[in-house]
Amino acid sequence: RDVAPSRGLGDVYKRQTLPQPLQALTTKAFAAAPKRAKRIVLISLDGICVAGFKQAKTPHLDALLAEGVLSTKTRVVMPSVTLPNWTSHLTGSGPEQHGVTDNAWTVSKHKLPAIEKDNEGYYPSIFSVLKEAMPQIKTAFYYNWGPLINPYNRRHLDEIGFLEKDAYIENYEKAFNFLIENQQSPTLVFLYSVHTDHAGHQHKWMSPEYIHSIEEADVEIGKLLDKMKQEGLYEDTHFMFLTDHGGIEYGHGGVSVDEMIVPWGITGPKIVKGLKIEEPNNTVNTASVILRLFRVDQPACWTGEIPSTIFK
């Protein structure tokens, strides 16, 4: 296990209240989530287009999202590539703020500086903001595409799990064990796989191989959910289903509907059940929703908003 120490950020990041228009937009969300979330699991698959999501046979994911909210009109940030969009999911901001404009970004080599950074050069992420506000929270990051972790300061991650060559099943097992070990603590788990994106690049988006890669992931999602149910962890957990872009032919990065519009979902306590939302949504909103569930204020530099219809 690659374990990093948990440390607070002190006064590294500045806080301020939401501007009046945003306060009005999210009044319902503030009122509807009085109790702090116990744990949040981010089920994250790379490169899932809406058509592929609909065509793939995913009974476990379908059953999960039927208990909550689903959007099939969520927009990604430009460019429609991996690192900018996952960074946007996990920092509540677009590339204009966090500065991750391509897949080659590193803390020491990039084109656009972030508008705000900690002492080590990292933009405030969901992990750093939560660790500052809730030192007791446990955070984990499981991934199988090397550059994915680059925008985040590892000292805010309690467990890191990296697998090579598109392997991901072991990370699902590690994530479950992490949830068991930390069931008495608030917990945030980012559980990611790139194999679905690579299937699109190698065989074409919407090819049988691409669809099969999504269905394979659903099997592991089902196993994780079943084990959580057996251990009594399912009912009080919030789950989010996330992706970063779609695809067309053998790639992505453009501005077509198939690349720019993706599925996005959330389920758990106080989340509306069986709702398909039509309101505007974007990858930058994910981290804002997570902070609201944990009852933590949003950094002033973030631009994410909370979809007003998702809470009961």
What name fits each language-model region?
Residues R1-Q16:
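Single conserved hydrophobic/aromatic residue that forms the stacking wall/gate
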Residues T17-A37, C49-V129:
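Active-site nucleophile/metal-coordination loop of metallo-enzymes that catalyze phosphate/sulfate
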Residues R36-I40, E67-S71, A133-A140, Q183-V189, ...:
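Loop/turn elements at helix/coil->beta-strand transitions in domains of secreted/extracellular proteins
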Residues V41-L42, H60, E216-V257, I290:
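Metal-dependent active-site segment of extracytoplasmic phospho-/sulfohydrolases and closely related
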Residues G47-G52, R75-V76, T87, K111-D118, ...:
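Second-shell loop/turn segments in exported
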Residues L90, V255-D297, S308-F311:
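Substrate-binding rim/cap in mid-to-C-terminal beta-strand-loop elements of soluble/periplasmic
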Residues H98-T101, L112-Y168:
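Catalytic-site neighborhoods of secreted/periplasmic enzymes
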Residues W145-F162, E173-V219, K223:
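Active-site His/acidic residue clusters
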